């Protein structure tokens, strides 16, 4: 778990085969040079053909998961990879400006510092870094005009307890059981959707995939409300039968 592996396949649904470890030019795998724990990798290819890897995990109180590694104290790490093999590091690691917990104090990131689940998107020339915060139940975003630096906190995208919406100031008032979440944003036919997961049966191991349309105006995303019908355009009619 200290390294990042790559698997390849000719079809997106599999069957995948091991391809190699992401490595430095000297052949040593990332994670083997005493870097912070490599976790939840996200890949982004920019319009100019440059390829970036984002990774990181900030929770110090999980010794089993960390397995002797150290958590990141400075937010997510970025590596530029060689697009010809998608394995070899050209530049990095570097930190992109999304604050860790200690660094967030007194900044817009305070209360929403980086935990895990790195994902990069680009809309209308602006880079949007999407991540799960130390609150765990929410996805937030930060923006920059560069994929490798200068990210400023943007806001909450979604919470699997609707924490942050009107009347839901904190987890104690959450509309349902909360837990960690991972996800990202997709633009489809001019509309934007946030994909994430919630937890059913009050168990962290029972993760249910979710999606909501999200409002996007003047470069800003506004927190989406969690529903069960995010891709249906509204509630189901309650007629007939529906697949689970």
What are these regions (language model features)?
Residues 1-244:
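Carbohydrate-active catalytic/glycan-binding domains of CAZyme proteins
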């Amino acid at each position: 778990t200290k390294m990042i592996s790559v698997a390849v396949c000719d079809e997106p649904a599999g069957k995948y085969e091991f391809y190699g470890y992401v490595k430095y030019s000297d052949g040593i795998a990332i994670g083997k040079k005493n870097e912070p724990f490599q976790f939840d990798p996200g890949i982004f290819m920019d319009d100019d053909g440059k390829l970036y890897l984002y990774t990181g995990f900030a929770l110090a109180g999980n010794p089993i998961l960390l397995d002797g590694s150290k958590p990141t104290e400075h937010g997510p790490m970025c590596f530029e990879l060689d697009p010809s093999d998608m394995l070899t590091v050209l530049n990095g690691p570097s930190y992109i400006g999304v604050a860790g917990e200690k660094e967030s104090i007194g900044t817009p990131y305070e209360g929403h510092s980086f935990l895990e689940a790195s994902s990069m998107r680009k809309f209308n020339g602006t880079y949007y870094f999407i991540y799960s915060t130390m609150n765990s139940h929410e996805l937030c975003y930060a923006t920059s005009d560069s994929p490798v630096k200068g990210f400023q906190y943007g806001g909450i995208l979604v919470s699997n307890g609707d924490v942050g919406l009107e009347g839901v100031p904190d987890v104690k008032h959450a509309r349902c059981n909360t837990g960690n979440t991972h996800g990202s944003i997709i633009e489809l036919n001019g509309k934007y959707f946030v994909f994430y997961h919630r937890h059913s049966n009050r168990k962290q191991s029972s993760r249910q995939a979710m999606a909501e349309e999200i409002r996007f105006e003047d470069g800003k995303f506004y927190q989406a409300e969690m529903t069960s019908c995010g891709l249906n355009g509204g509630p189901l009619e309650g007629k007939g039968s529906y697949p689970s």
